[in-house]
Curated annotation (Swiss-Prot):
UniProt protein name: NAD(P)H-quinone oxidoreductase subunit 2, chloroplastic
GO cellular component annotations of the record: chloroplast thylakoid membrane
Functional description taken from the UniProt entry: NDH shuttles electrons from NAD(P)H:plastoquinone, via FMN and iron-sulfur (Fe-S) centers, to quinones in the photosynthetic chain and possibly in a chloroplast respiratory chain. The immediate electron acceptor for the enzyme in this species is believed to be plastoquinone. Couples the redox reaction to proton translocation, and thus conserves the redox energy in a proton gradient.
Keyword set includes Chloroplast: yes
Pfam families to which the protein is assigned, alphabetical: Ndh2_N (PF19530), Proton_antipo_M (PF00361)
GO biological process: ATP synthesis coupled electron transport; photosynthesis, light reaction
Reactions that this protein is recorded to catalyse: a plastoquinone + NADH + (n+1) H(+)(in) = a plastoquinol + NAD(+) + n H(+)(out); a plastoquinone + NADPH + (n+1) H(+)(in) = a plastoquinol + NADP(+) + n H(+)(out)
Domain of life per record: Eukaryota
Keyword annotations: Chloroplast, Membrane, NAD, NADP, Plastid, Plastoquinone, Quinone, Thylakoid, Translocase, Transmembrane, Transmembrane helix, Transport
Main location: plastid
Membrane topology: Multi-pass membrane protein
GO molecular function, one term: quinone binding
Amino acid sequence: MIWHVQNENFILDSTRIFMKAFHLLLFHGSFIFPECILIFGLILLLMIDSTSDQKDRPWFYFISSTSLVISITALLFRWREEPIISFSGNFQTNNFNEIFQFLILLCSTLCIPLSVEYIECTEMAITEFLLFVLTATLGGMFLCGANDLITIFVAPECFSLCSYLLSGYTKRDVRSNEATMKYLLMGGASSSILVHGFSWLYGSSGGEIELQEIVNGLINTQMYNSPGISIALIFITVGIGFKLSPAPFHQWTPDVYEGSPTPVVAFLSVTSKVAASASATRIFDIPFYFSSNEWHLLLEILAILSMILGNLIAITQTSMKRMLAYSSIGQIGYVIIGIIVGDSNDGYASMITYMLFYISMNLGTFACIVLFGLRTGTDNIRDYAGLYTKDPFLALSSALCLLSLGGLPPLAGFFGKLYLFWCGWQAGLYFLVSIGLLTSVVSIYYYLKIIKLLMTGRNQEITPYVRNYRRSPLRSNNSIELSMTVCVIASTIPGISMNPILAIAQDXLF
């Protein structure tokens, strides 16, 4: 009898929860329409996978790519609408959030064709791979629009769980298993630290969880300059630091980059930084409004350490993926300059512009690494020697993307860094910008060292891997080369479209 009553109560509670969720989705679903498209794509993938055979594999790529493209289209149609707070204050829709969501969707759209040949050659499970990519994209999009502490915690956890599974996707690879274990342990520790910081912020504000209400709560409780806020700032900075991976929170990055499947690394290297940057700007700028001097100082230290350590250690690397891991640590140091400057001197606009260019430069480089790795089976930098003699297109594409990452004119990286450093200089960050300029010169050195190897034509320097280099007969080869071509073009000819890009970035503020 007791069991029967408990069962009825459980059914009633479940029904109420379902009706509440249905009510929220019915009245607020239009505010997350791009996200709903991805959810529909996920459900469709699961349905087709459970009712089809291996011959329908092309449909999986088509559904995933189409859902991402439609989601981008829906996002563009919503551009310039009035800011809206929905789901009882949990989610905010505005231009600033939407442009970061657009960048995440763009990353995922380019990463799927980049993964096709790799999946076919390694015989990875395709459906689960695409499901994890789409779910991680969904988590990143929700993080960009998160407006309360609970959503800011849950959304990155959705992204992180998929990231752990993707990094260990090749279960038979010992390096992949090692990378996954390090990533999981450090990710779990960082999440715990982040939640602890949120608890201090929650208590100091009098029990508020919405970002703007936290500010009002701190004013009402007179706790905005209390030690509790300083403790919250330190813990939250450490927690976000592991997501952004600046020095000294970068320990997991090289191992995960080296051990994970290359398309997964390409995906994580850009989407995680875009989503974490969007979240960091809102957390630091709104709840810690009264502690701006303190978090500016903390971020300046992180930026300096990242730019110096990332670029110096990258010089000594022998693996392309580890080199790009340390390079990404240096790159996030440049992005932090934009976060520090804020919207007073177009800091956010410069950060958004640079991240757009960074996506094309980084994904273009990883596309080249995927192709070379599949055709030779190596990742060693020295094994790239003489690639120009066998595949001029791949060698030139790699060279252009690397030069753009280094910031040489007239490539995209130059304009992105120029705008970013100029905004930092105008904001009075002279020392930070000087460090950025010096470390950019250092990065050009190790990029040029690789390009010299690519272009060498002397037989004694050409490695056996390049001598036996053969193009892949797979049709899917076209998809990865298409993705690579798009990234290379976006990395090389930004001067024509710089003014519209800057105008859009300047509009995408709070």
